[in-house]
Regions:
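A short, basic-hydrophobic beta/loop patch
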Residues: 102-117, 123-155
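Segments of small-molecule ligand-sensing domains
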Residues: 524-647
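Flexible loop/hinge segments that line or gate small-molecule binding clefts
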Residues: 372-395
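An alpha-beta-alpha
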Residues: 404-444, 532-554
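Periplasmic-binding protein-like
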Residues: 353-361, 380-382, 469-478, 500-508
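Short, charged/polar connector segments at secondary-structure boundaries
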Residues: 1-113, 119-120, 130, 175-188, ...
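Extracytoplasmic "Venus flytrap"
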Residues: 296-316, 321, 332-336, 426-430
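Hydrophobic alpha-helical segments within soluble ligand-binding/sensing domains
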Residues: 394-416, 507-526
């Protein structure tokens, strides 16, 4: 056993010497960090005795005091020769580790910002590190830093809250919000305290996950295992980690890398606000991109078209696509029925689908999962502001239409009060409310917008009528074919006899959108993007995807104003948010010298000062709206997990 201990020491010594030389050559500190030298006492808010824990070996990076710092390299491998007193003690500990006795006494250490600094037990730690022990028993005292605006300190406070629930080390995020999202992704309520069984189950599976991740190329390992796990849990159940062979698990993790990068990148989403130009672009020609001659296109529906005006509108768009592109495309529709979206997607792909249009936001998870398994298929989902690289999103700038209808409503109201029915509190909805309010104020400086929500129980139009509101903006009409028949949508006036007088109706033309997207694929535009950015098509009225039908019954002046606004928005000379804007709390949101960026517009979570209403709490929504808001909602990251979602 002595010979084995000596051999182990010599191996560890070489590792220590190599680390030391490499660190010195790169101008880095070659010894373990010393906590007392990097942390002034004035930065400490207090201490917390955590008791005896199993701590991650890789997280032990230093010592509490300087001591004899030349005995160990920064990787805790020895630097002194085998004849030294230090080496003799090290080897005796090694013999104990190899015997039935083992190293039983815990080290004593201080934890600061998730890293451990040893006060007693340097050699024990060194021996266990040399054997690649994943954890070390330790008596831990936490050093609590003073709260500050430093992002690292704020993130650590998030970790401390997570630790108070889970009592877990080794789960690391580098950006705010990760711990709360993990708690929710595992199916736990925000303040759920983990049981011993849950902690043990998670640790066992997470260890398998980490080992699979370590097999990725080194350049991919700048992201933490917890960051990869968050993306995994968006697509696959936690237990599946144990059920998949390690090589397959590693392959899946490599395919998730673009989404992991995208989630931490502030500019992860590329909002394409205009359709691609006609014909192959310069970059396509330079790269000699392969341009398809024929495409098999699958449309995925949540129900048959005759059961939903939304699905029927997309089916109308599908027909336009077929009529315009003829033999260049083969188009099939796939209806969910009672099946899982994943099943339908796999069937569509097995049938030869090159392009998949998923027409409902609830299909996002199934599309993302399919995209990791079928990287050569082009997936598009009818949603917006989603940071997923494998699936492109498509939607429209409805706020442009609402600005016009707001101006019409302001001109046509007989009072200063106008009703507005919003659908769901999702990205883009607030911008539409605000654009409508700004349009109304343009023609009626005293206009006030009474906001109600279709996602709440009851009839929002009836509630507005009961308040004496007679001019109301309802939701957009979803297809050109419905403009003449769905007067209850769009903006209308309620007459004395209860009948509706249509004023101006925003409407979608999905056929125009599908035609332009498919033509962009034929032109080679699909490939000319960075793999770490999520592409979201967010087109406006100039693209033809959205328009406003002005009623023939409008006065000539209002009709002319509506036309001028339409033309101005389409040519860019009119920008609804290029004006002085105050919110409901009196905060100046824009001084009028510039317009807001697309990202600022999409992510608005405030209302203009002439809007009376607020974003409804998730708990108040009708159940059928819950799934959409979980996926697209402004506050989706803060929502409680669904009941019964525990994955451990």
């Amino acid at each position: 056993m002595k010979a084995e201990a000596l051999a182990q020491y010599n191996t560890a010594l070489k590792a220590g010497q190599k680390y030391y030389k490499t660190a010195v050559s790169r101008g880095k500190y070659p010894y373990p960090l010393v906590l007392d030298e990097i942390l002034p006492e004035s930065s400490i808010a207090g201490y917390d005795n955590l008791g005896i824990l199993e701590i991650p070996t890789d997280s032990v990076i230093g010592t509490r005091f300087a001591g004899r710092k030349d005995a160990l390299a920064g990787n805790f491998m020895p630097l002194l020769g085998p004849e030294s007193e230090f080496a003799q003690k090290w080897m005796r500990l090694c013999e104990a580790h190899l015997s039935d006795e083992g190293i039983r006494d815990p080290i004593q250490c201080f934890e600061y910002l998730g890293r451990f600094y040893i006060q007693e037990g340097n050699k024990r730690c060194s021996v266990l590190k040399s054997y690649l022990a994943p954890t070390i028993p330790a008596s831990v005292t936490r050093v609590i830093p003073r709260w500050s605006g430093d992002p690292e300190i704020q993130l650590y406070y998030e970790f401390m809250h997570f630790y108070s629930l889970s009592r877990l080390y080794g789960v690391e995020f580098r950006h705010p919000g990760g711990y709360a999202r993990l708690q929710a992704a595992l199916g736990f309520a925000p303040e759920h305290i983990w049981s011993t069984e849950e902690r043990q189950s998670f640790s066992a599976v997470f260890s398998v996950f980490q080992k699979a991740l370590e097999k990725l190329p080194e350049e991919h390992l700048s992201h933490t295992a917890a960051e990869f796990l968050l993306v995994w849990l968006q697509l696959f159940p936690f237990h599946e980690i144990q059920e998949v062979p390690t090589n397959e698990l590693t392959a899946r993790l490599e395919k998730l890398l673009p989404d992991v990068i995208a989630l931490e990148n502030e500019r992860a989403i590329e909002l394409r606000t205009e359709p691609a130009g006609k014909g192959p672009g310069v970059l396509t020609k330079i790269l000699n991109a392969v341009i398809p001659e024929h495409l098999d296109i699958a449309f995925l529906y949540s129900c048959p078209p005759e059961e939903s005006t939304w699905v029927r509108a997309h089916d109308d768009g599908r027909k336009v696509l077929e009529d315009r592109l003829g033999s260049r495309v083969t188009v099939k529709t796939w209806v969910r029925g009672g099946k899982d979206y994943g099943e339908i997607l796999e069937a569509a792909i097995a049938d030869g689908g090159d392009v998949v249009f998923a027409t409902d936001a609830g299909m996002i998870s199934a599309c993302r999962k399919a995209a990791t398994l079928h990287p050569n298929v082009r997936f598009l989902n009818c949603a917006v502001f989603q940071p997923y690289t494998g699936v492109r999103m498509y939607n429209g700038r409805t706020y442009e239409c609402k600005f016009i209808t707001g101006a019409v409503a302001g001109a046509m109201t007989r009072s200063d009060t106008i009703g507005y029915v919003a659908n769901n509190p999702i990205f883009g909805t607030t911008a539409s409310v605000n654009a409508f309010a700004l349009g109304a104020r343009m023609t009626n400086p005293n206009a006030r917008i009474v906001l109600d929500w279709a996602c709440l129980p009851g009839d929002p139009v009836q509630r507005l009528l009961e308040q004496g509101v007679t001019v109301i903006s309802n939701r957009e009409i979803v297809s050109p074919s419905m403009v003449q028949t769905h007067f209850e949508m769009g903006t209308f006036r309620v007459l004395l006899d209860g009948s509706l007088l249509p004023l101006a109706s925003p409407f979608w033309d999905w056929g125009e959108l599908y035609d332009k997207i498919v033509r962009s694929i034929f032109s080679g535009d699909w490939k000319t993007v960075s793999g770490s950015q999520a592409i979201n098509y967010w087109w406006g009225m100039a693209s033809g995807v959205l328009d406003v039908k002005l009623s023939d019954l409008l006065p000539d002046g209002v009709q002319s104003l509506g036309q001028i606004l339409k033309e101005g928005i389409c040519d860019g000379s009119i920008q609804p948010f290029r004006t002085r804007i105050f919110d409901q709390h009196g905060e100046l949101r824009n001084d009028g010298s510039h317009t807001l960026s697309p990202e600022e517009i999409l992510s608005m979570d405030w209302f203009c000062d002439n809007v009376d209403g607020c974003i409804p709490d998730f708990s108040l929504l009708r159940p059928e709206h819950g799934e959409t808001v979980r996926v697209l909602g402004l506050y989706r990251d803060s929502l409680l997990p669904e009941a019964g979602g525990d994955q451990l």
